[in-house]
Amino acid sequence: MDFFYNILVTGCSSGLGKALFNEVHSHDHLRAFAHYRSMTADPFALYGDVNDSNFPDKLDEFIRTRQIECFINNAGVYEGNVLETNLLSQVKMLQVVYEYFAEQKKGRIININSLAGINPTAGESLYCASKFGLKGFSKSLQLEAIGSGVEITDVYLGGVQTRMTEGRDNYDSLMKADDVARHIIDLVNTKSYYVNEITLRKRNESCAS
């Protein structure tokens, strides 16, 4: 498989998405493209609410025009339209991206998931449902992708210092977004092997975070 060059990261306004975009941008051989919900000063970015009915069409046009070779599926919420944002909209985006990559016979999809997609936790039923759903869809897509040239990696994260976790009592002990971003982009930089899933968490962190 050819080396990836053009990378689109969704949900870049803050937190891990912003850290991922900056990490990609720091590598000379990688070209970073960002997605934001609201307009910014970036003239090369993709804009729009992932829950809008026309967003899949905007995404399709963007990835084809920019010849995106790696899609980092990071956009998500903890409260509000949880199922719509974390699952339904992501399924639609992944269908669009996978179809394009399959046509090109190459491409990498990196789904940013959560330990909540592996182990259920009390008080987070909707969030866990959205993450379990993303896991199921991605695992099925991995099977469909065999022989297509498309590689799909699921990243299950423990607690990360982002806007979503600012109110937690243990915020200071959570993983730093910049550190997590470096590990994830290491996957993009790896040509010699394919990782279909990886879990990142602090050594002393419960698997049910």
Describe the residue ranges of each PLM region.
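Rossmann-fold cofactor-recognition segment
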Residues: 42-54
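Conserved NAD(P)H cofactor-binding loop of Rossmann-fold oxidoreductase domains
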Residues: 74-79
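Active-site helix of classical SDR
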Residues: 94, 130
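Residue(s) in the substrate-gating loop at a strand-loop-helix junction
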Residues: 114
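Active-site-adjacent segment of SDR/Rossmann-fold oxidoreductases
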Residues: 119, 140-151
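C-terminal helical subdomain
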Residues: 150, 154-155, 169-209
